[in-house]
Regions:
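Cytoplasmic-side transmembrane-helix entry/capping segments in multi-pass membrane proteins
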Residues: 92-102, 124-126, 147-157, 187-194, ...
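Hydrophobic alpha-helical transmembrane segments in multi-pass integral membrane proteins
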Residues: 67, 108, 112-113, 118, ...
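Small-residue-rich segments of transmembrane alpha-helices in multi-pass membrane proteins
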Residues: 56-65, 101-108, 132, 152-165, ...
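A helix-boundary/kink motif common to multi-pass secondary transporters
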Residues: 63, 117, 121, 184, ...
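Small-residue-rich hydrophobic segments that form or flank transmembrane alpha-helices
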Residues: 29-97, 156-161, 171-232, 236
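Transmembrane helix exit motif
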Residues: 79-89, 118, 124-149, 236-237, ...
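Interfacial loop-to-transmembrane junctions
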Residues: 233-256
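Short, strongly hydrophobic alpha-helical membrane anchors
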Residues: 3-27, 268
């Protein structure tokens, strides 16, 4: 499957959308509702794991570009709620380093969007995620291990912006850089929330330019929008109440599931 912006819905679906601009397939909502809740929970800092499953799960019912477009308004509301919840916990110095590289990644994603092969992108992100987890398991870092070099952080953050633009799967690359920093759960969550607020906000004009923000996708997004506060509330409660050890274990589990699902999508 190729990520052509024009290949979002079939001609029959387009004619149906004119009379009723909303997805009505029950199967779509059966996969979209848990996907949106997972995405909300990701605003607690689990974005590298469970949140990155949202588009692959929704892609069981619609195309990857359409799933990404439907989630845009939902993501904006979630990002605003996450910013409000963690407004006192941002590391502004760290974000000043991350955000410019992330924006470079979104520009690259926008320029290459029409010619990218979705399966190749999914497979590469999946392989990278699983290799990162294997490295953490086989060669666990010592407590006094230095943080990753900034040049590696720049590469991973550009990759995060790129994969976030293509399929809202920017969590694994960014987390591969941020996790070794050993931030507290709340600080980790605040960093992810602020970074992806800026990245997701920057996608709106390119998505409109690519023709992804049509009325059918936006109307469907409005139906899913009430789930956003529920997911974010669940995620914030988790980030503020669980221990750092359990937090990172859950994060790794989410990344494992994401890596396996993306790898599966890449080769099937």
């Amino acid at each position: 499957m190729r990520l052509y912006a024009t290949a979002l819905v079939s001609p029959q679906s387009e004619r149906h959308a004119v009379s009723f601009p909303l997805i009505t397939d029950p199967y779509f909502y059966a996969v979209a509702v848990p996907a949106v809740i997972m995405l909300g929970v990701s605003k607690s800092g689990f974005g590298a794991g469970f949140g990155s499953l949202a588009v692959p799960v929704m892609a069981l019912a619609v195309t990857v570009p359409q799933a990404a477009a439907i989630l845009m308004p939902v993501l904006l509301l979630m990002d605003l709620l996450g910013l409000a919840a963690f407004r006192r916990d941002f590391d502004f110095k760290f974000l000043k380093f991350l955000i410019p590289f992330g924006l470079v990644g979104t520009v690259v994603g926008a320029l290459l969007f029409k010619v990218l092969d979705a399966k190749v992108v999914a497979a590469l992100v999946g392989i990278f995620t699983l290799l990162f987890l294997a490295q953490r398991l086989l060669f666990p870092p010592r407590p006094d291990s230095p943080p990753p070099p900034k040049w590696l952080g720049a590469i991973l953050t550009v990759t995060s912006g790129f994969t976030s633009f293509v399929s809202h799967a920017g969590g694994p690359p960014l987390s591969a850089y941020v996790i070794p920093m050993r931030l507290s759960p709340v600080k980790f969550a605040a960093t992810m929330a602020a970074f992806f607020f800026v990245i997701n906000l920057s996608k709106w004009i390119p998505y409109a330019w690519l023709g992804l923000l049509d009325m059918r996708n936006m109307a469907t997004s409005l139906v899913l929008l009430p789930l956003a506060p529920l997911g974010v509330w669940m995620g914030v409660r988790m980030a503020r109440s669980i221990s750092p050890v359990l937090f990172y274990r859950l994060l790794y589990i989410g990344m494992l599931l994401t890596g396996c699902k993306l790898l599966w999508d890449g080769f099937h």
